[in-house]
Amino acid sequence: MYENVFVIDHPLIQHKISLIRDENTGSKEFRELVGEIAMLMAYEVTRDLPLEEIEVKTPIAVAKTKVIAGKKLGIIPILRAGLVMADGMLKLIPTAKVGHIGIYRDPETLKPVEYYCKLPSDIAERDLIVVDPMLATGGSASAAIHFLKERGAQSIKLVNLIAAPEGIKAVHKDHPEVPIYVASIDQGLNEHGYIVPGLGDAGDRLFGTK
């Protein structure tokens, strides 16, 4: 359906997506579920990591085994909703470095503005995973990827729980080489820019704000 877009349809992920869509799911359970889904998605997102063979001594004999080789990983949550996804992924890849990008839309120009950015100093040497629960218009995600490229990033993946077709098209128009990993592609956006059926405002539901 879309090039360079991967829908992760594992039964556990799809079950948990159903739970976070439910308006009756409270903030505590919502946070836990988002972290769990992100951790499960990380398994697929990192499937193409290169391996190298090493030898280790077991209590019985020397074994030839494999470890991750090549570039190190970096997780970049888009503030604020991406934070919980980053925490979930860190449970699976605890050695990854974490950077943060904060973006808002200028009300007059409607262009994304970076208000916060703290990144590992060696991002050019890392495979970066940008995380944000929702890919709606694609403006924030595309801007975040642009800002990372400006700072030397060479390898970037985007991971979202739920995406709208409009967001996917916008990101791939600006960054066609960036793969997008999602748990669901929904119908589209409503007049307020929310994904339909979506799950509402992920940030508000994660942190109990309105």
UniProtKB/Swiss-Prot annotation:
Binding site residues for uracil: 195, 200-202
Cofactor dependence: Mg(2+)
Q: What is its EC number?
A: 2.4.2.9
Q: What is this protein called?
A: Uracil phosphoribosyltransferase
Domain of life, source organism: Bacteria
Q: What is stated as this protein's family in its record?
A: Belongs to the UPRTase family.
Record HAMAP family: Upp_B (MF_01218_B)
The record's function comment reads:
Catalyzes the conversion of uracil and 5-phospho-alpha-D-ribose 1-diphosphate (PRPP) to UMP and diphosphate.
Matching entries from Gene3D superfamilies are given as: 3.40.50.2020
Which pathway does the UniProt entry assign to this protein?
Pyrimidine metabolism; UMP biosynthesis via salvage pathway; UMP from uracil: step 1/1
Q: Which SUPFAM superfamilies match?
A: PRTase-like
Q: Which residues bind 5-phospho-alpha-D-ribose 1-diphosphate?
A: 80, 105, 132-140, 201
Record text on cofactor binding = Binds 1 Mg(2+) ion per subunit. The magnesium is bound as Mg-PRPP.
Recite the UniProt keywords alphabetically.
Allosteric enzyme, Glycosyltransferase, GTP-binding, Magnesium, Nucleotide-binding, Transferase
Query: What regulates the activity here?
Result: Allosterically activated by GTP.
Q: Which reaction does it catalyse?
A: UMP + diphosphate = 5-phospho-alpha-D-ribose 1-diphosphate + uracil
